[in-house]
């Protein structure tokens, strides 16, 4: 098992980009594909796209991002790649429904983002689980899917 305990930088950093470019032409850049929830973790174990068994053990002040370089030497590199995040888009009927939806999402500890009047909830599990919890608001029209 390969222990990765620090972030060396971002793949977009000019100092790292040239080295990564050369290694990628040689087929020596491995990726760790992380979900939106996994990218927030500081400790996890997973396999790279080439099958390397990796254990990420970061200090609390370090935060993974898409493109985080966790290993870089003359032979290979390991880079984090964030998986596409899917969202449940919800449109409240009015300001009262918006407040209720926001309050509910907060109580559920759901992360949210906004796109105009639409509240977007990142899906970290089956969409049906989210819809089941929102069923009363969807059924009476306080909230609809956007």
Swiss-Prot record:
Entry superkingdom: Bacteria
Q: MF terms per GO, please?
A: nickel cation binding; unfolded protein binding
Report the SMART domains cross-referenced here.
UreE_N (SM00988)
Subcellular compartments: Cytoplasm
Which SUPFAM superfamilies does the record associate with it? Urease metallochaperone UreE, N-terminal domain
Concerning InterPro entries, the annotation shows: UreE (IPR012406), UreE_N (IPR004029), UreE_N_sf (IPR036118)
Q: Which Gene Ontology BP annotations are present?
A: protein folding
- Where is this protein chiefly located? cytoplasm
- Do you know which Pfam families this protein is assigned to? UreE_N
For this UniProt record, give its keywords in alphabetical order, as a comma-separated list. Chaperone, Cytoplasm, Nickel, Nickel insertion
Q: Which GO terms describe its cellular component?
A: cytoplasm
Family classification = Belongs to the UreE family.
By its UniProt entry, which NCBIfam families does this protein fall under? Answer: PRK13261.1-2 (NF009752)
Q: What does this protein do?
A: Involved in urease metallocenter assembly. Binds nickel. Probably functions as a nickel donor during metallocenter assembly.
The protein here is known as Urease accessory protein UreE 1
Species, as recorded: Pseudomonas syringae pv. tomato (strain ATCC BAA-871 / DC3000)
For this protein's source organism, the top of the classification is:
Bacteria, Pseudomonadati, Pseudomonadota, Gammaproteobacteria, Pseudomonadales
């Amino acid at each position: 098992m390969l222990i990765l305990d620090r972030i060396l930088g971002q793949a977009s950093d000019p100092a790292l980009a040239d080295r990564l470019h050369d290694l990628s032409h040689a087929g020596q850049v491995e990726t760790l594909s992380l979900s939106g929830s996994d990218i927030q973790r500081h400790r996890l174990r997973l396999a790279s796209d080439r099958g390397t068994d990796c254990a990420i053990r970061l200090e609390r002040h370090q935060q993974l991002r898409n493109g985080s370089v966790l290993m870089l030497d003359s032979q290979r590199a390991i880079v984090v790649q964030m998986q596409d995040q899917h969202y449940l888009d919800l449109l409240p009927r009015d300001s009262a429904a918006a407040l209720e939806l926001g309050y509910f999402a907060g109580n559920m500890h759901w992360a949210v983002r906004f796109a105009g009047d639409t509240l977007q909830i990142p899906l970290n599990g089956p969409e049906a689980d989210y819809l089941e919890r929102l069923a009363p608001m969807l059924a009476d029209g306080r909230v609809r899917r956007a």
